[in-house]
């Protein structure tokens, strides 16, 4: 499913029917107010800023995004544990197989529905990716020659499910793939105090898709941007298209805007 083929681009006259000047002003002001370094203090994006090396930042971002569900006070310590075990050298920790010592291959709970076995197999598949392609960045460049976010999301879904790993990375893009969309926001958006922007030359940030969850859905509905409470890639693309009307060169600035609107209201 590709945003460019599933979303009908509305003309400017129709745009005015779902987005008035007040809504546009509210979202632009909220984006400016909340996309700051302080945002990192309570966001899992914080962890990817800790490693010094570029490819360690990539791996930390990928793992942190995959772990980011549920209550932050519960999953933050789990991400911190991985950072501590690796001593911030994520690539070396995975390639050396040291993760197998720190996260033994058993059925004990690691975090919520993720057992140690699930995490172990996930990290093993990530290890295979790093061995085969050299880095997450090179994987992205290889699988997204069209520079589109949806192409790379599909590639991640396919790669991590080739060997039956279906618990952490979605099987396909029927779901909203929230955590993969969030990971790509982190990696692609440039000139941000929050996002790294390391892959801005690989993925066109105009093709990024909003990480869709119940909170985003709620605020988007309150503003009249969408009229559904379901989460799917189709809905994520629809909302992203609306945000692109406000932020043409950087639609995921709207992610901060909706967050800020929710806080303010």
Task: Annotate each PLM feature.
Residues 6-7:
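Generic short N-terminal amphipathic or hydrophobic helices
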Residues 14-265:
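HhH-family (HhH-GPD) DNA N-glycosylase catalytic core used in base-excision repair
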Residues 10-12:
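Generic cytosolic/nucleocytoplasmic N-terminal low-complexity/intrinsically disordered segments
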């Amino acid at each position: 499913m590709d945003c460019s083929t599933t979303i009908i681009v509305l003309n400017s006259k129709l745009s005015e029917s779902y987005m008035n000047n007040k809504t546009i002003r509210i979202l632009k002001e909220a984006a400016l107010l909340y996309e700051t370094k302080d945002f990192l203090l309570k966001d899992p994006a914080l962890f990817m800023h800790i490693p010094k090396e570029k490819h360690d930042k990539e791996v930390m971002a990928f793992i942190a995004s995959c772990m980011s569900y549920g209550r932050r006070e519960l999953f933050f310590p789990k991400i911190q544990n991985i950072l501590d075990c690796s001593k911030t050298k994520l690539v070396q920790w995975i390639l050396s197989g040291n993760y197998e010592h720190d996260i033994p291959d058993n059925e004990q709970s690691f975090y919520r529905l993720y057992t140690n076995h699930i995490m172990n197999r996930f990290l093993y598949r990530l290890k295979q990716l790093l061995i085969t392609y050299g880095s997450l960045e090179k994987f992205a460049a290889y699988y997204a020659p069209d520079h589109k976010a949806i192409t790379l999301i599909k590639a991640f879904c396919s790669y991590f499910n080739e060997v039956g790993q279906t618990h952490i990375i979605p099987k396909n893009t029927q779901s909203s793939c929230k955590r993969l969309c969030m990971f790509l926001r982190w990696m692609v958006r440039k000139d941000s105090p929050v996002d790294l922007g390391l892959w801005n030359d690989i993925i066109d940030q105009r093709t990024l898709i909003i990480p869709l969850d119940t909170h985003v859905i709620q605020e988007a509905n309150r503003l009249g941007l969408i009229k559904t409470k379901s989460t799917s890639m189709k809905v994520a693309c629809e909302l992203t298209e609306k945000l692109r009307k406000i932020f043409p060169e950087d639609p995921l600035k709207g992610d901060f805007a909706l967050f800020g609107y929710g806080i303010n209201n």
